[in-house]
Amino acid sequence: MEALRRAHEATLRLLLCRPWASGAASRPKPRASEVLTQHLLQRRLPHWTSFCVPYSAVHNDQFGLSHFNWPVLGANYHVLRTGCFPFIKYHCSKAPWQDLAPQDRFFTALKVINLGIPTLLYGLGSWLFARVTETVHTSYGPITIYFLNKEDEGAMY
C-alpha cells in the first residue's frame, strides 16, 4: 500500500504542482484530515455534509481510506471518501461509531476493479458543476472547498 501511495503522490505532483513552475510545489499545504475536521467544526458539527477539496490544495494523508469513522469533539462521523481527480470527495454523516473496515475494503476494491474510471468522471463532473464554495480556515491558511449543492445549515438530509 505504501508503494501505491508514493506512486499516486508522484503522479499527482506531476499533474497538479507542475514542478517546473516556480513556487508551485514548495507552498506548504494542510493535511486533508485537517481540512475535514476544520470544515466540520466551522459548520458546528452538522448532521451531514458533502464537499470536494482540490488535490492541489492539501497533503493527502488519508490515502487508501474509503469508509471510516472520524471523531470530532465528541461527535462521530461516518466518512465516505474517494479521490475523484482533480478533487478529493467527502460525504460525512453524523452517526455512532461502528466497525466500517468491511465496507472500507469493499469500496476500495470497487475503485480498483473499476480502474478509477467512475471516480475520474465524477471528479470531472464536479469540476464542471461545483460552483458553491466555502473557505475553510486551517493552520496553513484558507482553503477553498466546493459543493455541488448549497447545503442548508441544520438540515437533517
Curated annotation (Swiss-Prot):
InterPro entries given in the database record: DUF4528
GO cellular component, one term: extracellular region
Coiled-coil annotated residue ranges, if any: none
Localization (cell): Secreted
Membrane-spanning parts: none
Keywords, comma-separated and alphabetical: Secreted, Signal
PANTHER family in UniProt: SIMILAR TO ENSANGP00000021391 (PTHR34651:SF1)
Protein name per Swiss-Prot or TrEMBL: Uncharacterized protein C15orf61 homolog
